[in-house]
Amino acid sequence: DLPSHPTADENGFRQDVINLVKELGVTCVRYPGGNFVSAYNWEDGTGPRGQRPIRRDLAWHSTETNEVGIDDFYRWSKKTGTEIMLAVNMGTRGLKAALEELEYVNGAPGTELADRRVRNGITEPMDIKMWCIGNEMDGPWQVGHMSPDEYAAAVDRVAHAMKLAESGLELVACGSSSAHMSTFGSWERSVLTKAYDNLDFVSCHAYYYERGAKSLQDYLASSQDMQTFISTVAACADEAKNAHTGDHDIALSFDEWGVWYSDVWNQQEAEWKAQSGKDLHHESWPKAPRLLEDIYNAADAVVEGSLMITLLKHCDRVRSASRAQLVNVIAPIMAEKNGPAWRQTVFYPFAEAAQHAHGIAYSPVIDSPNVETESFGLVNALDSVITWDETNHSGLLLMV
């Protein structure tokens, strides 16, 4: 059965949430994850809802009903006016599944999988251009995680084959899950040097929260860490290009960034492990459990704005960026079941930048006092960027 919220449309999607997504100014949404994708069968989310298989989701210890799949999400993207960045499973699957999904979503009618899409109600190709080849494959928490050399070989094979199918795709390799991974830097060098010819982007992921910093002042200066992350990965991308005497730059896709109180999740995981022990257990896993529903404050909004400014200041290298997540889970939008949807504090800086920051980005020269931080030394008290829209002859100063 479709959700019964008063604002639900004919596909079961809440229109109050759709309106907030439009207000937020999101232009591209990464789907279906995230850790979730590494054990996901894309076919499970196609066809009649009543015939879709129910699976266990290893990433979040929950039951996945597959009520929403790629066809449904494509329809939602049309309602919200967003582009889809599609991630493929490199944990339990790989080359064959990626090619079959590509044929299903983008193929012209006349082949088996494209015709299956047509039978499922999507007559036109979805024309999804940007594809993530796996998610956080360096992370030991990831289903099917790999060593740098293992992933480099795998992504090279998959990217090569996908570009044989569609040369115009934009392909994103997994970079480091954070700048604090033990393999940070060496992972990027291994992957990009091996697979340079067929890659267009490398991903970056970073989350921040006050309890994870040495002080409130250090937390407010989190963008310093993001800047170092960007410059390090950009240098690795340049090394790979030079090693190949290449003809294209590998851009950065900062496709997970934001504020996440990750210590709460780490505690939840530890409790699960303690409860399960070493015994076999047969209890059912919950459906759509309430996880990672962080409630944000004013300091979080300041950090969100500063991170957005940092991404804009480095838009020559960061060509795509996606804050994580969108609704309920570490999100700017909250939606209660059978209740209202509302905006969190972090909604506002993102929405303002998305609405007004267009055109060319400039780093302004602003004289401001310095503040002392334990992690980054002296940093400017003000963080800012200027954008200029030549078409409309309008400029914007973003500052926190």
What are these regions (language model features)?
Residues H205-A221, E269:
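Active-site His/acidic residue clusters
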